[in-house]
Structures are given as structure tokens and as C-alpha cells.
Amino acid sequence: MSKAILGLFAVLGILGGYAFAADTLSAQDNFEIQQLYARYNIAIDSGDAEAYAATFTPDGVFNNMAGHDALVGFAKMWREKLNGATRKHWNNNLQITGNSKQANGFVYLMLIDFSTKPASILTTLSYTDTLVKTKAGWRFSKRTTKSDTPPAVADQAPAK
């Protein structure tokens, strides 16, 4: 009887380990999520408000803005605020954890102004993200930012 129980635990352990391994974030999922981060940056930098909003779920949230229309409005406002300046989002140190259905991401951002000579770093911050896999692929369901610049310092920064 003890051999049967031991055998049963061994089989359950193997199957349980396989089930756990089967629902980890695959290399393909990692790649698709990295591409999502790239599409997000390119869309906001190029002023493509619809492409920007499409990186989110329909009810997606960016800081305090929620839903497709609010995200499109934000991207349009951002483009108008630039007033022709060339600014680019540069991400580094991307970390992704999760499984085949949802993931968490963390990444640093440098916002660089290329309309100045030499180019200048406008700000640095971090994104903390919740992502979900939809029928259309990976999308952000929630993105929050945290500035590296304390508000008192940011308020005193020279206007560009």
C-alpha cells in the first residue's frame, strides 16, 4: 500500500510540475510583449492616437485615464502639446513575469527631446504594467507611471 501511495504522489508531482510549466510565460509571449512595448512607444511618438489606444484593452487604464476614447484623447493632446518637437520614448530594463493569459511588466523610460542640440533627456520614470492576452494579442490593461523627479524639483525645471 505504501508503494502505491508513493507512486501516486510521484505521478501527481510529475503531472503537477508539467501543468505548472505549461502555464508559464513562453518565449513567444515574451517576444510579443516586447513588441507591444515597442508599438506603444512608436505610436505615441508618431502621434498615431488610434494605434496608441490599440495597445490597451478596450477598458484599459493609463494613470487616471480609462477606456479607448480617453486614451485616444490623451494621445492627441500629447501630440498637440509637443508643438512640432521631436520627442522619443526610450525604454530599458524591461522585466516581464506571468503566465499564458496575464503578465506584469516593469520598465524604465527616458523621454528624450531631439529638437534640442544636443538632444536632452526631459524626464525619467518607470512604468508598472498589467497585461492580458486577448484574441488580438497582448494588450495593456493598466499602466501606471512613477516619476524619478520629485514634484518640487519638476516644478522648478526650466520650461522648454
Regions found by a protein language model. Give the residues of each.
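Bacterial N-terminal signal peptides that target proteins for export
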Residues: 1-7
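Short, cysteine-centered beta-strand-loop-beta hairpins and adjacent loop/turn segments enriched
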Residues: 83-84, 112-121, 150-151
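Short, low-complexity N-terminal intrinsically disordered segments enriched in polar/charged residues
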Residues: 17-46, 50-58, 69
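A solvent-exposed, acidic/Ser-Thr-rich amphipathic alpha-helical stretch
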Residues: 49-111
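Short beta-strand edge/turn micro-motifs at domain boundaries
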Residues: 104, 124-157
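Beta-strand elements of well-folded, non-transmembrane domains
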Residues: 109-115, 133, 147
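Exposed loop/turn and edge beta-strand positions of beta-sandwich/beta-sheet ligand-binding modules
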Residues: 90, 121, 125
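Bacterial N-terminal signal peptides
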Residues: 7-16
